[in-house]
Structure formats: structure tokens, C-alpha cells
Amino acid sequence: MKKVSRNLLQARQMVDKNRFYSLEEAMELVKKTSYTKFSGSVDLAIRLNLDTRKADQQLRGAVVLPHGTGKSVRVLVATDSSEVAAKSLEAGADLIYSTAELEQNLKIDNFNFDVIVVEPKLMPILGRYGKKLGPKGLMPNPKTGTVSPNPEKAVAEIKKGKANYRADRYGIIHSLIGKTNMEVPQLVENANTLLRLIKRLKPNTVKGNYFKNLTVSASMGPSIKIRFDNL
């Protein structure tokens, strides 16, 4: 613990907590201040002027990042169609389960996957396992593209590097935008892709400043403030 605390202290000393950095400067710092021996995740935290109690201000979805997330994702497609199964495997699916196999595995808590992709007609079956899948973030959702009439397309997008985003009850979106071993321009482009989408999705009922705060951090590193006056 002492070593981790010392590393974190040294990392924090590299960051001026009163300064708002440009996106490029922030991505350079997030790489320098990550003190893990492995490539850590880079997460963007976007605080928005939202009241998520209102239905039209609940932002949730997914975006394909131009340089991917850097994270390997194990994708399961549940289908009883041999054609869908073949296309999904070709698109990069790691597992194919029939509906019977899916239920068998869910009953014994065999969660050997990171994402489930299904066709809309299978959602009533998955709904029975909501208490198991929901807390693990595994329940498919149309907004994130994991409930789709074209599972193979969903698989291809996930494998390409799809990042989910969701505003919490405080109006803050936390999203993975890459790994610390990625180049600064790649992280910047990924961040801009997400930020442009969030800006475009601004609800019409939001008054005043939409963006309230913007920070980036590595999984093991300090939080770095980013300028957002130009968003």
C-alpha cells in the first residue's frame, strides 16, 4: 500500500489541480501519470447539466471509437438461426448459444462472456434473468445496440471498439476511451468522437451551460481537468 500511495503522490505532483488542460495536454499527462506496470484504461468523465429524473434527459447509448477501446471483449450471440450464427461467427463472435444453451448457462451462473447480443424476439427469455444480468451490466439493450435484428452487425461494431455511455443520477457520464499504451492523437480522436456525440444529443429542454465539468484519468492515476469552453 505504501508503494501505491507514493506512486499516486508522485503522479499527483505532475498535475496542476487548478489548471484546465487542453485535450492534447490532458492525454499526454494521463499517459505519464499512470503508474501501473500494465496498460491501464483511460476513462473520460463528463459532467452535464442534466436532470436524469426527466425521461428526455436520460442519455444512454454506445459509440464506435475510431481507434477502438484497446480492450478485448468476449461476445456471445444467442440465436436459434444457423444463418445468424454463421454470420455472427464470421463477424467475430466468440460464442454462439441456442436459447436452450443460454438458459442452461444462466441458470448455473456461467458468465464466460462480456457482452450478450440477441435479436429482439429473445428479450422475453432474457427478461427472466434480469436480476442476474442487470447488476453485472450484461443485460442487452437496444440503446447500446446489443438488441438488434442484425446481430452480426452488432458484433462487428463491438469488436471494432464500441464504448458504452450512460448518464448517472448526477448527470455524469463515465466512458472508456482507450488504454494508456495508445498514442496521444488516438486518445484525442476517440475523446472528440464521444464529446461530439454527447453535444449532438443535448436535450432541447436543457437550459444554460450543457457541459459542467470534464476530466480524464487512467485506471491507476490522478484526475486531470480538461478545458470545455470550446465544446
Swiss-Prot record:
Quaternary data: Part of the 50S ribosomal subunit.
PROSITE patterns to which the protein is assigned, alphabetical: RIBOSOMAL_L1
InterPro entries with a match to the protein in the record: Ribosom_uL1_bac-type, Ribosomal_uL1, Ribosomal_uL1-like, Ribosomal_uL1/biogenesis, Ribosomal_uL1_3-a/b-sand, Ribosomal_uL1_CS
GO cellular component term of the entry, any: large ribosomal subunit
Keyword Amino-acid biosynthesis: no
Family affiliation: Belongs to the universal ribosomal protein uL1 family.
UniProt-listed CDD domains: Ribosomal_L1
Domain of life: Bacteria
Protein name: Large ribosomal subunit protein uL1
Known function: Binds directly to 23S rRNA. The L1 stalk is quite mobile in the ribosome, and is involved in E site tRNA release. Protein L1 is also a translational repressor protein, it controls the translation of the L11 operon by binding to its mRNA.
Keyword terms: Repressor, Ribonucleoprotein, Ribosomal protein, RNA-binding, rRNA-binding, Translation regulation, tRNA-binding
One Gene Ontology biological process: regulation of translation
UniProt entry tagged with the keyword Signal: no
Gene Ontology terms for molecular function: rRNA binding; structural constituent of ribosome; tRNA binding
HAMAP family: Ribosomal_uL1_B
PANTHER family: 54S RIBOSOMAL PROTEIN L1, MITOCHONDRIAL, LARGE RIBOSOMAL SUBUNIT PROTEIN UL1M
